[in-house]
Amino acid sequence: MARKTNTRKKRVKKNIEAGIAHIRSTFNNTIVTLTDTHGNALSWSSAGALGFRGSRKSTPFAAQMAAEAASKVAMEHGLKTLEVTVKGPGAGREAAIRALQAAGLEVTAIRDVTPVPHNGCRPPKRRRV
């Protein structure tokens, strides 16, 4: 039986001017996804995908690097302006937004879409270190 060679599809260059940056910032990691206005992903990056491990994943610097990496790929697709949606309580929220602006993308709006429970699940107990 012939063995299939693992061929990767070449990324098709899209020409998209405006998009949305979804920043998911948790206590452990920061994930940045850049999409078009319909929500179709153009590029994504995270602190863990860039090689940060353990407690270094949750730092603002790691979030900044993730935002830079995602914006570099998205700008190749022609992305220029962004709306930013931020979700989660993590340390990398502001750092990721600043990195997107520094990369040359124009931020038109910042929206906080962190889910707030109407007294749903019991939160984790306090840490005693």
From Swiss-Prot:
NCBIfam families documented for this protein: PRK05309.1 (NF003698), uS11_bact (TIGR03632)
GO CC list: ribonucleoprotein complex; ribosome
Domain of life (superkingdom): Bacteria
InterPro entries: Ribosomal_uS11, Ribosomal_uS11_bac-type, Ribosomal_uS11_CS, Ribosomal_uS11_sf
Gene name, Swiss-Prot/TrEMBL: rpsK
Species per Swiss-Prot/TrEMBL record: Bacillus mycoides (strain KBAB4)
Name of the protein in its database record: Small ribosomal subunit protein uS11
An example molecular function term from Gene Ontology annotations: structural constituent of ribosome
Pfam families, alphabetized: Ribosomal_S11
Free-text function comment from the UniProt entry: Located on the platform of the 30S subunit, it bridges several disparate RNA helices of the 16S rRNA. Forms part of the Shine-Dalgarno cleft in the 70S ribosome.
Keyword Plastid: no
Gene Ontology process terms (BP): translation
Family, similarity comment: Belongs to the universal ribosomal protein uS11 family.
This protein's UniProt keywords: Ribonucleoprotein, Ribosomal protein, RNA-binding, rRNA-binding
Subunit structure: Part of the 30S ribosomal subunit. Interacts with proteins S7 and S18. Binds to IF-3.
